[in-house]
Amino acid sequence: TPLFIDKYNENIKFCSPVSGKIIDIVRGEKRRILDVIVEADSEISYEKMDVPLNEDLSREQIISIMLKSGVWPFIRQRPYDTIANPNDIPKAIFISSFSSAPISIDNDFALYGMDELFQKGLDYIVKLTKGKTHLNVSNNTNPSQIFINAKGVEINKISGPHPSGNVGVQINHIDPLNKDEVVWCINPQDVIVIARLFNDKKYDVSRIV
């Protein structure tokens, strides 16, 4: 269920991660919303999304479904690291499978056993660009097979210390932006969220942190 919408684009919805009721809205300076606090039900229920069974969906159909379901805000746009504009066509899409920052999430562990779901998410994501979808893995470790065996994407091995896992650094080295160009970025666990939407027809944002 949507909690609020983007005032600049009413098609972009921000949905509640749980079923329940809003108990507080925390505002900061100039009434900026800082937190929307939702008290979860004892048993989480999911709204069934209207997702066609046909897997051969067009780019426009995929974007429409993502907007209506509330998963669109997981797609970020560079430059400026804002929510992607669904009316733009990115020159490429970037997914950094690792974080080089200390004490950060291990995506090899977080996505363990989700190979099919991850690939399903990629199958939809690659349709959002006419260019390449770059899946970047660390060359400093042995990346999980979930990333190495991914299909339909360009796999790039990245070496070096922090901030080598930063997607902005990766873009600058692999496919630098020219004037008026944009690229879209997405986190590996959010690829799973998109896959669940099309696979299970529900907005399930559960994840390992």
Regions found by a protein language model. Name each.
Residues 11-19:
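Short coil-to-beta-strand transition motifs
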Residues 9-12, 26-209:
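Buried, small/hydrophobic-residue-enriched core segments of structured protein domains
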Residues 1-3, 209:
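Generic structural signal for buried aliphatic residues
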